[in-house]
A protein has these predicted regions:
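Feature captures the catalytic ectodomains and active-site-proximal regions of enzymes
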Residues: 1-422
């Protein structure tokens, strides 16, 4: 069945933007819910029982399929196209839930691995200013801005643990109850600096292709005994949506490739006492990158408002073309806010960061001091149909036809699909 009641809970913010949900129907509550279903221990807010048919099950195994960017809008479009999506809707329950803010993979994988909100763990975006490093870096690949290999920040002597304000993982908490956590990770990042932190306490199974990942997942489900959480993240659909845009034939083909492969491999799984969960971290919006509005090209004087870090690096805006976080020299704050609102107020919500905190866009208070230092001073949230960004040749630009991070319904409404047999 489709449990679409939560759609009415998304409150308007301004224009076509809506507020995220954290209290119940939220991606943020997936880790606590998995922990509760497998251990009986309640660590905090849970997904409501109607996501599971009215009462919480207590399976022996939980399998989480984390399909990057395949949110509510795409489930609505494709639910009748594939055997597994039809089965979730016809035999299980499909519920819209809120993504985090920002609606990004960096925030979401950190929350899923640590069990706390970005308000606490402080890693909220791909491009993010880390005060301990004195510069804006790309968080998950742990590299400086520009063209650098993954984990290049290690060569600069940066401690990757300083990216996160929290380090105990959900896997370590499950282990204290005798529950195994088995995470399926692509070889390109399985041993990365970030992944070693976020998957501490888990068994990591590596793969190179989707088919390899799904066969290994199926074999593990069939072989494992005892309580276990198995989780597979797949980023292929998101990658194509970025490169070509959602709604294109490339995007549709990648979606078909994922689900048809899944249907084929899991057509005869036949394992009982296993609960399957399907979720996403966000959706996607399309804009031609050639139409990107660059703040500092429209108003070159804005470059003078950026502060310098203690290591003499300019603190460039963090975020993406869908969510921009600007650090501004204190003495220029009022002037910067006025200029930004006057020049870009027709295409974006432009507010002091304190507004986002007061509106609890990052979740309930308190906010960790480290997150507050990273956020900067001014938040720019583009309305639907617009990319707004900062242009720094070789470092920051807008080349993607698809993006996310903002607060439109297309970006923010994710999904929780639940079924007990495939």
């Amino acid at each position: 069945m489709i449990n679409d009641g939560p759609l009415q809970l998304f409150e308007p913010l301004v224009n076509d933007l809506v507020k995220p949900i954290y209290a119940d129907y939220s991606f943020a509550n997936i880790p606590n819910t998995i922990h509760y279903l497998l251990t009986g221990e309640n660590l905090g807010p849970l997904l409501p029982p109607d996501c599971f048919g009215g009462r919480y099950p207590h399976p022996n195994k939980i399998v989480l399929l984390f399909i990057d960017s395949f949110g509510w809008q795409f489930w609505q479009e494709y639910q009748s196209h594939f055997r597994t999506t039809r089965r979730v809707v016809e035999q299980g329950i499909l519920t819209p839930i809120s993504a985090l803010f920002p609606s990004t993979t960096a925030a979401s994988v950190s929350t899923l691995g640590l069990g706390v909100l970005p308000a606490e763990h402080a890693l909220y975006e791909w491009n993010i200013y880390i005060p301990a490093y004195g510069e804006v870096i790309q968080s998950l690949p742990f590299r400086p801005l520009g063209k650098h290999p993954d984990d290049a920040c290690l060569a600069k002597g940066y401690d990757p643990r300083q990216m996160l304000a929290v380090h105990e993982t959900v896997h370590q908490r499950l282990a204290r109850h005798g529950v195994r956590s088995i995470q399926f990770a692509h070889r390109s990042y399985a041993s990365s600096a970030f992944n070693k932190i976020i998957q501490a306490g888990a068994e990591v199974v590596r793969h190179s292709t989707l088919a390899e990942a799904l066969v290994k997942l199926k074999e593990t489900i069939s072989e494992i005994t005892g309580k276990a959480w198995l989780s597979l993240y797949w980023g292929g659909i998101d990658a194509i949506a970025h490169a070509y845009g959602p709604g294109t034939s490339y995007h549709a083909g990648e979606i078909a490739s994922f689900w048809q492969t899944f249907d084929y491999i899991f057509r005869d799984i036949g394992v009982t006492d296993t609960l399957y969960l399907f979720t996403a971290d966000h959706g996607h919006v399309y804009v031609d990158p050639r139409q990107t509005i660059y703040l500092n090209e429209r108003v070159p004087a804005l470059a003078e408002f950026l502060p310098m870090s203690p290591t003499a690096n300019p603190i460039y805006p963090s975020g993406s073309p869908r969510d921009i976080f600007m650090h501004v020299r204190p003495e220029r704050f009022a002037e910067a806010l006025t200029i930004l609102r006057r020049t870009f107020g027709d295409v974006a919500l432009i507010e002091p960061i304190e507004m986002a905190l007061d509106q609890q866009l990052f979740g309930p208070q308190p906010i960790s001091p480290e997150l507050r230092r990273r956020l900067g001073d001014i938040l720019i949230l583009p309305f639907a149909g617009h990319f707004v960004w900062w242009h720094e040749p070789g470092l920051l630009n807008s080349r993607n036809y698809g993006n996310h991070g903002g607060l439109t319904r297309e970006e923010l409404i994710s999904v929780m699909g639940v079924v007990d047999a495939l």
